[in-house]
């Protein structure tokens, strides 16, 4: 399933929200979303299960929950506007969905930056089979 998410990120191009999220991650962390965040831990990438492995994986868990709370929105494809002012992401005008999606992505990108010190390479390309514990609730 994660492979599909990686392919989606690569195929979406500049017209999709996943591309924008990737750009936010790059600007906030200095790391490319692929490979650093697309298959990290139990929640970074498509879907998620089990317990988050660390603070970075928890950022992805919270991001999944944020997307899950959106109604009638398409967070992986809806394009939104945002800018950066003095290093701060500012979500722009748009529909309520676009604004909420932007805020979810912004929170995750900032969370990744705030947890760079505890990022562990051993959780990159983490096997799903090791994520079988009961999932937390959002």
Swiss-Prot record:
A GO-annotated cellular component: extracellular region
UniProt site positions, description: Putative hydrophobic membrane-disrupting site (MDiS): 19, 26, 32
GO biological process, one term: negative regulation of T cell proliferation
Disulfide linkage: 42-131, 44-60, 59-111, 65-138, 66-104, 73-97, 91-102
CDD domains: PLA2c (cd00125)
Top-level taxon of the source organism: Eukaryota
Signal peptide: 1-16
Positions marked as site (Important residue of the cationic membrane-docking site (MDoS)): 121
Annotated positions for site Cationic membrane-docking site (MDoS): 133
Site (Putative cationic membrane-docking site (MDoS)): 79
InterPro entries in alphabetical order: PLipase_A2 (IPR001211), PLipase_A2_Asp_AS (IPR033112), PLipase_A2_dom (IPR016090), PLipase_A2_dom_sf (IPR036444), PLipase_A2_His_AS (IPR033113)
Molecular-function annotations in GO: calcium ion binding; calcium-dependent phospholipase A2 activity; phospholipid binding; toxin activity
This protein's UniProt keywords: Blood coagulation cascade inhibiting toxin, Disulfide bond, Hemostasis impairing toxin, Myotoxin, Pharmaceutical, Secreted, Signal, Toxin
Cellular compartments annotated: Secreted
SMART domains in alphabetical order: PA2c
Gene3D superfamilies xrefs: Phospholipase A2 domain
Functional note: Snake venom phospholipase A2 (PLA2) that shows low enzymatic activity even tough it conserves the catalytic residues. Shows a strong myotoxic activity and induces indirect hemolysis, anticoagulant properties, and cytotoxic activities. In vivo, it induces muscle necrosis, accompanied by polymorphonuclear cell infiltration, and edema in the mouse paw. It exerts its function even in the absence of extracellular calcium, indicating it is not a calcium-dependent enzyme. A model of myotoxic mechanism has been proposed: an apo Lys49-PLA2 is activated by the entrance of a hydrophobic molecule (e.g.
Homology family: Belongs to the phospholipase A2 family. Group II subfamily. D49 sub-subfamily.
Entry protein name: Basic phospholipase A2 homolog bothropstoxin-II
Species for this entry: Bothrops jararacussu (Jararacussu)
Taxonomic classification: Eukaryota, Metazoa, Chordata, Craniata, Vertebrata
């Amino acid at each position: 399933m994660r492979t599909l998410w990686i392919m989606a990120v690569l195929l979406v191009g500049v017209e999709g929200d996943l591309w924008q999220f990737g750009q936010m991650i790059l600007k906030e962390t200095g790391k490319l979303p692929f490979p650093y965040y697309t298959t990290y831990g139990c929640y970074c990438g498509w879907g998620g299960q089990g317990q988050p492995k660390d603070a970075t994986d928890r950022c992805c868990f919270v991001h999944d929950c944020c997307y899950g709370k959106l109604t009638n929105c398409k967070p992986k494809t809806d394009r939104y506007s945002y800018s950066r002012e003095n290093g701060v992401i500012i979500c722009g005008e748009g529909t309520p969905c676009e604004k909420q999606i932007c805020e979810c992505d912004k929170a995750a990108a900032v969370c990744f930056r705030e947890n760079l010190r505890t990022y562990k390479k051993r959780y990159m390309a983490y096997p799903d089979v090791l994520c079988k514990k009961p999932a937390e609730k959002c």
